[in-house]
Amino acid sequence: MDFRELSKLAYDLRKDTVDMIVAGKGGHIGGDMSVMETLVTLYFDQMNISPENMNDPDRDLFVMSKGHSVEAYYAVLAKKGFLDIKEVNEKFSKFGTQYIGHPNNKLPGIEMNSGSLGHGLPVCVGMALAGKMNKKDYRVYTVMGDGELAEGSVWEAAMAGHQYKLDNLCAIVDRNRLQISGNTEDVMGHDDLHERFRSFGWHVIDVADGNSIEQLHAAFEEAKQTKGQPTVLIANTVKGKGSAVMEDKASWHHHVPSQEDRKSTRLNSSHLGISY
């Protein structure tokens, strides 16, 4: 798929995500919408991963560290062929289901249970180090929320990533600047996030528009060429991206959209020039 087709796919999957949250009567919709292009770029443009190679020790590895954005993750996994979207919508967030509100590695395609913030990067450091020790060529990716960076374990892992020169590790910060209690800078300010990661020995790539497939593609390609140190992408995204009523509003961190809200999610893709 080209960049335009991938952008359309991201909006299609936003619709699936909204439908899932409505059916389940709850979900972290704001972060789902902001991270969608990152997930689409990883799964449909970058990573060596498919339902057919999940037992391949050379497959790329992904951990959704900001596990509360699981609805977007489920939608992408379903499109990739790991899950059935109809079943997900029927069972999501229901009593006794495996389709719970955070990633569950009993489901196909999910490497790690996550959602307790600050755990994804430490585990990915271990995965990347194992790859180096076993002389494997796979790459390891994790997506973190910017609010998650208040967890100290993130920075312990960042220090270890530099120590072991894990150039097969790429972290992505979904930098939408909002969390459940408001603006991230008011809750626990990050100062200059780029310089902070650089001070820990990481190669830092600023993605000016983290909802641009083309910019994300270029950033991931640069990360692949970076040697001797891990890479972090600071993806500047918009919480609630794709919906006129949700964009850049902390109140949509966890919310169930109305029928009118669902319509706006599709209408706001008109800039792609693609008819639904």
Give the location of each predicted region.
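Glycine/aspartate-rich loop-and-adjacent alpha/beta segment that forms the canonical ThDP
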Residues: H203, I213-R266
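Glycine-rich beta-alpha junction loops
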Residues: H68-S69, Y73, N176-R177, T237-G240
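Single conserved hydrophobic/aromatic residue that forms the stacking wall/gate
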Residues: K263-Y276
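Cofactor-binding active-site loop characterized by glycine-rich and histidine/acidic residues
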Residues: E5, T17-M20, D32-Q163
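Histidine-centered active-site/metal-ligand motif
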Residues: H28, H68, I100-H102, H119, ...
